[in-house]
Structure formats: C-alpha cells, structure tokens
Amino acid sequence: MLSTALSISQCLTYWASTREHGALPNRVLVTGASGQLAHFIVRVFDDREVIAHTRTSLDVTDPDAVRRTVADTAPDVIVNCAAFNNVDGAEDAPLEAFALNALAVRSLARAAEEVGATLVHYSTDFVFDGSATEAYDDDAAPGPRSTYAASKLVGEWFALDAPRALVMRVESLFGSPRNWTGRRGTLDAIVDGLRQGHEVRVFTDRVVSPSYTPDVAAATRHLLNVRAAPGVYHCVNAGHATWQQVALEAAQVLGVAPSLHFVTTDQVPLRAARPKFCALATRKLSATGFAMPSWQDALGRWIRGQSL
C-alpha cells in the first residue's frame, strides 16, 4: 500500500503532467496551412497529431467539403487560419471576402459543433474604428470601417455560434521564417527594405500593436491547455507604437542607418479606410496566466533569428 506522502506526491506529479499535456487536444485540424501563422501553429503542436489543409486540399468556402472533412477527421480542435486578407482588394471583391472571412467560418463552426470540437478563429484589430485614445479592451464595441473589417466581424459572430469557440484578434502579424516565400506582412516588408538599404515608406499617424506569429501560436496552445472560456481574446504583443517608431526600432536592432520616408494616411490613396489607432489590450489573455512579451522584445527575437 502506498504511503500518504507518496500518494500525494504522485497526485501532484499527475496534476502537473495533466496541466502541461493532458488538457491539450490530441488531434488538431488546421486550415489555411500555407500561411505564415498556420506555419507556426503546426510547429507549436508538433507533439500532437496535426492535419493541415491548404486551399488545394480543403476549400473552406464549400460547406459540404468542410462538413465531410471534419466528420472524417474528428478533430479535437479546428484552428482556422484561412482568410481573405487583402484589405483594399475586399472593396473590389466583397463577395469573395465575405465567403472566406464569414460564411466559411459559419461552416467550420457548425462542423465543429457536430463533432464536439473547439474552434479557434483569428480576427483583426480592423473591427474597430480607430477613434479610441487608449488600447481597445477585448469587450470594446466594434465599428468596422471597410468591407474587409465588416467581413471579419461577421466571421467572429459566426465563430461564436459554436459552443466552444476562441476568437483571437491579432494585429500586424510579423515573423516570417527564413527563406519564406509566402505572403508577408507590413513589418516583414519594412525589415526586408531596411536590410537591403532601400527607402522605406512608413506611416507616422497609425498606431499599432504588432503580433509576432510564434508568440500568437504559443498563446493559442496556452488557451487550449488551460481550457479557456469561450469568447474573444486579444492576442498582440505588449505595448503599441506608430509605424514610424516600429521602423526606427527595427533599424536599431539591425544596426543600420535607415532611409525612411514618413507619410500620413491622408497622403496615401487607399481604397479601404484604415483605423488610425489600433492598439489592443490583452486583459483576458493575461487573466489566463499568459503574458505576451513586448513588441520590442518580439521584434528583437525575430531579427536575431530566435523563434520557436
């Protein structure tokens, strides 16, 4: 018979093991697998069974294909990284934007409910109008100003129809792996330009909270591990800055003398309106025990080649 002390020790060991691994999903289905965020989602769950689908293997805008794939796979979690991210292009192709950013999410939410899976869906800071003077809380009222933003907001609503859904709002994603050939974000382009000695155009009047993709992936794993309550979670690196400040920080980390062309949003013709103040607060994510590092820390880790 085990002693009481040994039994307690074993129980504590088991509890710690469960907290690290047992609460995590065994099978993860990832959509939009050719994108940068999905790349790191697949990596962060490398100790799980991951089924990753690109647009070629699963058209998420086809409800029957979604239902059939989810039923056949029976995942514990669906992580939706598929999205129409061309903000200006959405003004010219609203049907395509809503099909991928909203209706596809409805199909995934319904399929997740049918198999009892948790749905993780990524949204955007663009659901806000940018009129705030301090970082937007997770529960702040949205006010989309473009077709893209509206399609993402409707996608959030559809995602939250699923009984177990985590909607994670990210912003200005960056952190493409070395030799990455896929789509790159604004900060990736800024750093590339600085490295190559090109003149880089940056906004002086847009405030952002950049999101480092490996940190977003780690936060996603954490929320699933602690079985976070369904709802909306802001997932950005701590702090905020103008694109001008971000570019200057990147140049300092790179050790280069930057050639920067400063502009305001009013000076650049854009088809879709952008919110000027996009800082997000991570109150709910922090309350689960996960503290996002500062954007400066994340930028430094990325530029110096540190990632997952």
Predicted features along the sequence, with ranges:
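NAD(P)-dependent short-chain dehydrogenase/reductase
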Residues: L160-V208, D215
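C-terminal amphipathic/interface module of NAD(P)-dependent oxidoreductases
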Residues: W15-S17, A273-L308
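Active-site "gating" loop of Rossmann-like NAD(P)-dependent oxidoreductase/epimerase domains
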Residues: V87, D92, Y122-R145
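NAD(P)H-binding glycine-rich loop region in Rossmannoid oxidoreductase-like domains
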Residues: V60-L100
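Mid/C-terminal beta-alpha module of Rossmann-like enzyme folds, strongest
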Residues: A219-T220, V226-R271, K276, I303-R304
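Active-site Tyr-X1-5-Lys
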Residues: R145-L166
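NAD(P)-cofactor binding segment of oxidoreductase domains
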Residues: D92-V120
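N-terminal Rossmann NAD(P)H-binding glycine-rich loop of SDR-like oxidoreductase domains
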Residues: V28-V44
